[in-house]
Each structure stands twice: as structure tokens, then as C-alpha cells.
Amino acid sequence: MPNYALADLLEKTKIEQILQLAEINAELEALSAQERVRWALANLGSEFALASSFGIQSAVMLHLVTNESPKVPVILTDTGYLFPETYQFIDQLTLRLSLNLYVYRAEISSAWQEARHGKLWEQGVDGIKQYNRLNKVEPMRRALDELNVSAWFSGLRREQSSSRASLPVLAIQNGVFKFLPLIDWTDNDIEQYLNQYDLPYHPLRDEGYLSMGDTHTTKKWEPGMTEEETRFFGLKRECGLHEEDAESDGSGI
């Protein structure tokens, strides 16, 4: 790939950013996931992070990125409502992959939030958005700021939902580079990688879960359901982490 003056890209106008990102992404689409990660580490600054929900297929991204950058900070935004199996999975992968794990939480405890606001996840789309702002978006923003992150990795894939179908490999979100090396991978690609490196799926996959989140907004898949309908009562797919100006909404990982 040609060299790009990416240090200056964040200072350019929105139109200039769009044009240059389109050129870069055309090149990145031709690379393998491993090559994309290496390119990002060589071109997107010096301070990186990997955001992980430790969901169904999270072992792939964690293994892929830490193979190239073993000490990269792994950011988990812990709502306090994850499944017990998710917390056990976090412990398992942290030990096995020697993860440099950083756990960020809302500044107000879950019990205090319920006392103040009630069960926000039962209050329609607006309640879910507020819940996500408090428990996902603000902690992630704080993590990126405190770790001085120049670019962060995420395991989003186009195949996962309609809201992700047109996402590029490289984007700028809220003034920080966001990099999606698995964006064009299929479920079969994921399975092959897990098998190749003897990596586990999340344990609840075997019980019918396709996507993992909080206990109160995650459902098992049933015949006729899309993957999107297993999260947030089908009202939303995203949790907030993957939207521009996400603090004003609250939508995904």
C-alpha cells in the first residue's frame, strides 16, 4: 500500500477525510485481516486499544490483535449485568491470551441507576439509549481519553446486521481512528479461525445465543428470529459504541 499522511488526516475537513478514507479503504479491502492489523499498527499512531464485549466470537479478535501487539490494552465496558458465563469467559480468555485488560464502568453503580431512573431497559428506545449512554458510551469515551488512544480495534462484521452492512475497515469516529479488520469475514471464516487456533466460542453459544449482551436485553435465538432481534427486544442492534457523536444516542458492540 502507498504511504498516507494519516497524522494530518484528523485535522482535515469532513469532505477531505471522506475522500482520503475511501482511497485507503479501497486498498485495505484487498488485504487479509492479519495484514490489515499490521498496517494499522504501522500507520495509525502509537497508542492503540482493542474494545471487546467478550461475546460469542470475541476470541478471534482478541487472538488476532494480541498476536501482533501482545500488550495492547483490551477495553471492557462492564455494565454489571453481564451473564455469569460472560464473566467466566473473560477470566478464561484473559488468562489464556495474557490479555492486558482494562475494565471501565459507569460512574454511578447499577443499583444507584435503578434507584434514580428505574429499569431504563424497560422504558422503550429512549430508555435503552440512556442506559447505553451511561453504561457503554461514557465509560468507553473515558477509556479512550485516559489511555490516550490514537486508534482502536473492534470486531464488527458486515454480515452481523443491516446496521453494519456498509461499514468500512477504517473510519474516524469522534476524532479517533476506528479499525475493523474482520469487517468482511463470514461466520464460516470465524469458525475456521477458531478451529485453526483451538479457540473457544462463548459458552452460551451452545445454548442458542447468537449475540451476547446484558442478561435483561439478550434473548436466545428462536426459529424465525434474526440475530438483531435477539438484542434490545429487537428495538436496537447497537449499544452506542459505533456511532458518530455516540454520546448523544447510545448504540453497539
From Swiss-Prot:
Major subcellular location class: cytoplasm
Listed GO biological process terms: hydrogen sulfide biosynthetic process; sulfate assimilation, phosphoadenylyl sulfate reduction by phosphoadenylyl-sulfate reductase (thioredoxin)
Enzyme Commission number: 1.8.4.8
Any one Gene Ontology molecular-function term assigned to this protein's record: phosphoadenylyl-sulfate reductase (thioredoxin) activity
Cellular-component GO terms for this entry: cytoplasm
Annotated pathway: Sulfur metabolism; hydrogen sulfide biosynthesis; sulfite from sulfate: step 3/3
Keyword annotations from UniProtKB, A to Z: Cytoplasm, Oxidoreductase
Active-site residues from the entry: 239 (nucleophile)
CDD domains: PAPS_reductase
Enzyme class: oxidoreductase
Function (record text): Catalyzes the formation of sulfite from phosphoadenosine 5'-phosphosulfate (PAPS) using thioredoxin as an electron donor.
Family: Belongs to the PAPS reductase family. CysH subfamily.
Name assigned to this protein: Phosphoadenosine 5'-phosphosulfate reductase
Lineage, uppermost ranks: Bacteria, Pseudomonadati, Pseudomonadota, Gammaproteobacteria, Vibrionales
